[in-house]
Amino acid sequence: LDEVYTNGAISRIDIANKTNITPATVSSLTSQMVEEGLLYEAGETFDKKNKAGRKKILLSICHDHSYFIGSEISERYYTFSLTDNLGKIIAQTAYPLVNNEIHLTSEYFISKLQEFLLASPVSIKAIGIALPGHFNYIKADQIVTNNPLWQNFSLATIKGAFDLPVFFSNNVNCMALSEKLYSPDKEDNFLFFNLARGIYCSYVY
């Protein structure tokens, strides 16, 4: 599935060659994904190296299989986006933050996320939240940062407030992942730099 997201329309044999997974296993897994509506057969292409062989059947991502909410937490705003599983934005809103004591709390964030979730016209599969700091999977309650503004911001409280899978990651890592999946000029290996309050670099390989 990662190969299809990264490369676009691709044949089963090309997936097998790129991943070193056996063609039989690739065929079995992709057939199951087609049945589940994750992938669809987008057309055929000729194999230039083997003109006498069968045409390759290309697989692509079904854009309307699942819908997700993505959110970014920052000092100045909370943003919420509703997307399909190809990253197309269906709805988006931002809440500016003025009063730090009230707005920079997990309770206020939850209230705004619940508002956005209730307004969604489609069923949501999961929620992803980009953090202004690191996320520690062992001590998963707080944003790992030296910024005192987030010391009372409880990630565990946020996760427990919703009956959906909730995922956290550093905001620059999220930007780099988006670049990998959706940029038309993507490369297999690149560095993504973000200059803000500090400098952060994410390495994709």
Positions of PLM-derived features:
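Glycine-rich phosphate-binding loop and adjoining helix at the ATP-binding site
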Residues: 93-189
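Basic amphipathic alpha-helical segments that dock to polyanions
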Residues: 4, 15, 26-39
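Short amphipathic alpha-helical interface segments
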Residues: 1-10
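A short alpha-helical element within helix-turn-helix/winged-helix DNA-binding domains
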Residues: 9, 14-17
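Conserved phosphate-binding catalytic cores of ATP/NTP-utilizing and phosphoryl-transfer enzymes
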Residues: 41-66, 168-195
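Short beta-strand(s) of the beta-wing in winged-helix/HTH DNA-binding folds
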Residues: 11, 40-41
